[in-house]
Amino acid sequence: MSPDPLTLAAAEQARNVAVQMMAERGRGLVLVGAARLDLALEHLLKAVMAPSADPDDKLFTPDRSLGSYGAKISLAARLGLIEAPIEQALHAIRSVRNDFAHSAGEPTLAEPRHQKRLQRVYPEAEPSPLWIALAPLLQSQSGLTAQEQSFILLVTTLVASIEACALLQTPFSPRATVRFRSR
């Protein structure tokens, strides 16, 4: 029996994310992972939104209300699209990403403050079938620290899960809309 299209799409997303992140080290690894999560959240939110009438929709551009990674996380949580442990993991990654992006030095995932944030969320993600399947493959990759391996596993698991969830969504359909005149 062949896997269903959703499983294949999630597997392809996971592979792409893992390959992208394994090509990076240090700051690049964290920034690429967080950027990929930001994009996955945008896909999830757009999947439940009515399409924009404006072909040049700027709702998700950096200077707009949903332009930040944090705003996307919060909205996805408030809409019930992600559960609390996923929200916590995304915020932990956001905090690490912010530290890496604004550090003048050479930050590493081994630093205690980053480990403290991430160690809170790893136990929730580790039982994921995707994490379990990818962990041995990453362990065989030379040059990656244990912290980098765990971070890649977390981000890959999250991106694949969020993208798969986005594929299952349909646009929100309100029972009524606000109008100036009744129809």
Q: What does each of the following model-derived ranges do?
A:
Residues 1-183:
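Amphipathic alpha-helical interface elements
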